[in-house]
């Protein structure tokens, strides 16, 4: 029924101006003309978008909320880090970052960062 429809990721922010600055200057997204009051809409690849709306509080999630697919994660992580994005570092039995990236056999490579509201964002390159 919805298999061929466009999809958007939706995040919440307590400060839309701060979020706009972060996603434009650090992540490199462009604000869409579809942006409406109390919302930010960023155009992403293949007709997808990221919507961020303003709210007084943000419920913190302990999982990835948005995942950007990458053809070259090493390059993308390097550029994001140069733009001031701070990556999460892991050293557990199941996850170990090397140069900000976790390699998962049979799956791919991932790197995670948090936006100013603590939303967890991933960059992912499949195997």
Task: Annotate the PLM regions.
Residues 2, 68, 78-127:
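Vicinal oxygen chelate
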Residues 15, 72, 115-117:
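Acidic active-site catalytic centers that drive phospho-/nucleotidyl reactions
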Residues 10, 38-39, 110:
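A short, glycine- and basic residue-enriched loop/turn
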Residues 18, 73-77:
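Short, conserved charged micro-motifs
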Residues 1-20, 64-66, 124-127:
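N-terminal beta-strand motif that seeds the catalytic metal site of vicinal oxygen chelate
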Residues 30-64, 68-70, 88-89, 120-125:
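Conserved short beta-strand elements that form part of the metal-binding/catalytic scaffold
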Residues 17-30:
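Amphipathic alpha-helical segments
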């Amino acid at each position: 029924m919805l298999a061929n429809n466009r999809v958007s990721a939706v995040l919440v922010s307590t400060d839309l101006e701060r979020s706009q600055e972060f996603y434009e200057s650090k992540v490199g997204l462009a604000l869409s003309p579809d942006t409406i009051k109390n919302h930010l809409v960023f155009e992403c690849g293949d007709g997808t978008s990221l919507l961020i709306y303003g709210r007084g509080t943000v419920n913190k999630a302990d999982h990835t909320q948005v995942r950007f697919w990458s053809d070259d994660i090493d390059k993308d992580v390097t550029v994001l880090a140069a733009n001031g994005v701070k990556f999460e570092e892991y050293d557990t039995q199941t996850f170990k970052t090397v140069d900000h990236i976790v390699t998962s056999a049979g799956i791919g490579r991932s790197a995670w960062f948090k936006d100013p509201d603590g939303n967890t964002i991933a960059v992912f390159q499949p195997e």
